[in-house]
């Protein structure tokens, strides 16, 4: 009986720790994307010609939402992922220290 309780407690702790890591990573990533939106306006890099402008246009409308609640803003996170895939070299250049 004690082993079952210990096992369940261990599983809960592991789940909480992994969940917090995901939230932290996501928060950092959203912060990075918001920064890229501001800093990336004049950076062409390896982006497609329209990639940066599209993201910045989205960010201008959603910037407050991204910064305020990136954990639950699925649309912002999705756009961040698209931006990350399209403009990885620019993102890494702008956001290496964040």
From Swiss-Prot:
Write out the similarity annotation. Answer: Belongs to the teretoxin C (TC) superfamily.
Q: Where in the cell is it found?
A: Secreted
Q: Which organism is it from?
A: Terebra anilis (Auger snail)
Name by which UniProt lists this protein: Tan_12Cys
State the coiled-coil residue ranges: none
Q: What is the disulfide pattern of this chain?
A: none
The record describes its post-translational modification as: Contains 6 disulfide bonds.
Domain comment?
A: The cysteine framework is C-CC-CC-C-C-C-C-C-C-C.
Kindly state the tissue distribution recorded for this protein: Expressed by the venom duct.
Which residue ranges run through the membrane?
none
Q: Which GO terms describe its cellular component?
A: extracellular region
Example GO molecular function: toxin activity
Q: Which keywords label this protein? A: Cleavage on pair of basic residues, Disulfide bond, Secreted, Signal, Toxin
Prosegment location in residue numbers: 22-28
Instruction: Specify whether Disulfide bond is a keyword of the entry.
Output: yes
- Signal peptide annotation: 1-21
């Amino acid at each position: 009986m004690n082993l079952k309780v210990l096992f369940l407690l261990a599983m809960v702790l592991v789940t909480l720790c992994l969940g917090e890591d995901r939230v932290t990573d996501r928060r950092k990533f959203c912060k990075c994307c918001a920064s890229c939106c501001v800093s990336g306006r004049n950076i062409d890099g390896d982006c497609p010609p329209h990639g940066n402008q599209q993201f910045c246009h989205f960010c201008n409308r959603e910037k407050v939402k991204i910064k305020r609640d990136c954990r639950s803003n699925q649309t912002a996170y999705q756009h961040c992922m698209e931006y990350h895939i399209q403009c990885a070299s620019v993102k890494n250049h702008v956001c290496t220290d964040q």
